[in-house]
């Protein structure tokens, strides 16, 4: 499905919240959307690895990495696993790496920046809790839509207007 966030904002002004303009598109999909799954971790992508190995059909993984710019929470190998398991995309409040490969992967990826160093792997983090960044709170089970215009969230699923 192709989403256009300005059209969704116009059609559903009472439902959508717009994430502050701080994320950039790194994935092979320019637009993506789905039900939110949340994860909170700081400079440790162990739980990201676990989640992308699960079925992600119709889902978007929202990763609150604390805004760290000191390591990447997603690279080409995990992105490939996410695409293989049907994830629509990932939104990362942190960094990614292997950006040339990410751009060729059939996956939506929005993140703060690229950084070549990988994260630690200590198994530290939390799943399925509300996470807040970019001026909005992402809640598990709600919906996220993203394109090159930005990222929006809604408590219920949205359909593109005719």
Curated annotation (Swiss-Prot):
Q: What class of enzyme is it?
A: lyase
Signal peptide coordinates: none
Name the residues that bind substrate. 75-78, 97
Q: Which InterPro entries match?
A: RraA, RraA/RraA-like, RraA/RraA-like_sf
GO terms of biological process kind: regulation of RNA metabolic process
Provide this UniProt record's keywords sorted from A to Z.
Lyase, Metal-binding
Pfam families, sorted:
RraA-like
Q: Does the keyword GTP-binding apply?
A: no
Q: Which cysteines are joined by disulfide bonds?
A: none
Q: What does this chain do?
A: Catalyzes the aldol cleavage of 4-hydroxy-4-methyl-2-oxoglutarate (HMG) into 2 molecules of pyruvate. Also contains a secondary oxaloacetate (OAA) decarboxylase activity due to the common pyruvate enolate transition state formed following C-C bond cleavage in the retro-aldol and decarboxylation reactions.
Q: How does it assemble?
A: Homotrimer.
* Family from the record: Belongs to the class II aldolase/RraA-like family.
Protein name, per record: Putative 4-hydroxy-4-methyl-2-oxoglutarate aldolase
Question: From which organism does this entry originate?
Answer: Pseudomonas syringae pv. tomato (strain ATCC BAA-871 / DC3000)
Q: What is the lineage of its organism?
A: Bacteria, Pseudomonadati, Pseudomonadota, Gammaproteobacteria, Pseudomonadales
């Amino acid at each position: 499905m192709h989403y256009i966030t300005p059209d969704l904002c116009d059609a559903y002004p009472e439902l959508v919240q717009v994430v502050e303009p701080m994320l950039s598109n790194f994935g092979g999909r320019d637009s993506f959307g789905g039900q939110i799954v949340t994860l909170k971790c700081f400079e440790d992508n162990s739980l990201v690895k676990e989640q992308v190995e699960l079925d992600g059909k119709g889902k978007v993984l929202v990763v609150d990495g604390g805004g760290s710019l000191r390591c990447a929470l997603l690279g080409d190998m995990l992105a490939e696993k996410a695409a293989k398991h049907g994830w629509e995309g990932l939104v990362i409040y942190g960094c990614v790496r292997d950006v040339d490969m990410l751009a060729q992967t059939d996956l939506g990826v929005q993140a703060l920046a690229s950084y070549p160093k990988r994260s630690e792997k200590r198994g530290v983090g939390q799943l399925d809790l509300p996470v807040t960044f970019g001026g909005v709170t992402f809640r598990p089970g709600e919906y996220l839509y993203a394109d090159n215009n930005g990222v929006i969230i809604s408590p219920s699923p949205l359909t593109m207007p005719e």
